[in-house]
From Swiss-Prot:
Role according to the record: Catalyzes the ATP-dependent phosphorylation of L-homoserine to L-homoserine phosphate.
GO biological process: threonine biosynthetic process
UniProt gene name: thrB
Reaction catalyzed: L-homoserine + ATP = O-phospho-L-homoserine + ADP + H(+)
EC number(s) stated in the UniProt entry for this protein: 2.7.1.39
Disulfide bonding pattern of the chain: none
Primary residence: cytoplasm
Location in the cell: Cytoplasm
GO cellular component labels: cytoplasm
Lineage, top ranks: Bacteria, Bacillati, Actinomycetota, Actinomycetes, Mycobacteriales
Protein name: Homoserine kinase
Species name: Mycobacterium sp. (strain KMS)
Pathway: Amino-acid biosynthesis; L-threonine biosynthesis; L-threonine from L-aspartate: step 4/5
Protein family (similarity comment): Belongs to the GHMP kinase family. Homoserine kinase subfamily.
Coiled-coil ranges from the UniProt annotation: none
The keyword Cytoplasm belongs to this UniProt entry's keyword annotation: yes
Length: 314
């Protein structure tokens, strides 16, 4: 049985950017950042209206193919509801195609907005586990999606493949001494474009190297930030992507040469530095700025939030 939502319901969702992989944790580790998109949705009698402010304005589709719309509709279907019409307003601060989880934020935010609508009916909203499952299915991997749902850092895993894949995540508490410095370039790059650069198979030697570093990174993030340099080493994906983003690769070299644990954020080209110092070395900052990177400290991001009505704003 399906319930048709009445016109006049409104909901707001706020969802964080995220950085995936964190070096060795390919498709497994994620970290939410304090940079947020906001989605406001209203049910109407018919039709679809989509508006976008900020990142992506004038570039993304404003019809039913919009990722937020698709996620809202998927969330409603999963709860047994439909909306005869929608007005969707997106206010985006998360840069697109930079490796900061903008697509995961769109999906998680859309699902959360659907929850905000459903919570005003007698039907049951999606659980956290369902949010992780549905958003990860959209993405094809759970690292960004789970970080956006739960906030903080996450370890994620996948059972099965294809349509049968099941996704799950466990949260990590990031050590308070760790400072996060995303560095965002003007260059864009999609995950699909850079994923084709990766080999289909890897050696046991390389697999063993990354397994040890990924396990160590969990310790470094939560208990021993002094281990971050060793814990963020990677041989499985960053070297293979370097030729496609030379400025990012060189910036990583400069940062790590200054003793800063720095990695590609997701598939890049953004870079994120994790440091126990409150500022980055001047040499590294000067290099980044000269090469078109915008560098700013961010806090660990919160998990997705939704509410009924239109929020007062960030």
């Amino acid at each position: 049985m399906t319930q048709t939502l009445p016109a006049g319901l409104t909901a707001t969702a706020t969802v964080a950017a995220s950085s995936a992989n964190l070096g060795p944790g390919f498709d497994s580790l994620g970290l939410a950042l304090s940079l947020y998109d906001e989605i406001v949705v209203e049910t109407v009698d018919s039709g679809l209206t989509v508006t976008v402010e900020g990142e992506g304005a004038g570039q993304v589709a404003l019809d039913s193919s919009h990722l937020v719309v698709r996620a809202i509709e998927a969330g409603l279907r999963a709860t047994g509801c439909i909306a005869p019409g929608l007005v969707v307003r997106c206010r985006n601060d998360i840069p697109h195609s930079r490796g900061l989880g903008s697509s995961a934020a769109a999906v998680v935010g859309g699902l959360a907005a659907a929850n905000g609508l459903v919570s005003q009916t007698d039907w049951t909203p999606l659980t956290v586990e369902q949010l992780i499952q549905l958003s990860s299915a959209f993405e094809g991997h759970p690292d960004n999606a789970a970080a956006a749902v739960l906030g903080g850092a996450v370890v994620t895993w996948t059972d099965g493949a294809g349509a049968q894949a099941r996704y799950a995540a466990a949260p990590l508490r990031v050590h308070p001494d760790i400072h996060l410095f995303p560095a965002i370039p003007q260059q864009r790059s999609s995950t699909a474009e850079t994923r084709v650069l990766l080999p289909d198979t890897v050696s046991h030697t390389d697999a063993r190297f990354n397994l040890s570093r990924a396990a160590l990174l969990v310790v470094a993030l939560t208990e021993r930030p002094d281990l971050l340099m060793a814990a963020t080493e990677d041989v499985l994906h960053q070297p293979q992507r370097a030729a496609a983003m030379p400025a990012s690769a060189e910036f990583l070299r400069v940062l790590r040469g200054c003793g800063v644990a720095a990695v590609l954020s997701g598939a890049g080209p953004a870079v994120i530095a994790l440091s126990t110092e409150p500022v980055l070395p001047a040499e590294a900052v000067e290099f980044g700025i000269a090469n078109g990177f915008t560098i700013a400290e961010m806090a660990v991001g919160d998990g997705v939030r939704w509410s009924t009505g239109v929020a007062a704003g960030r």
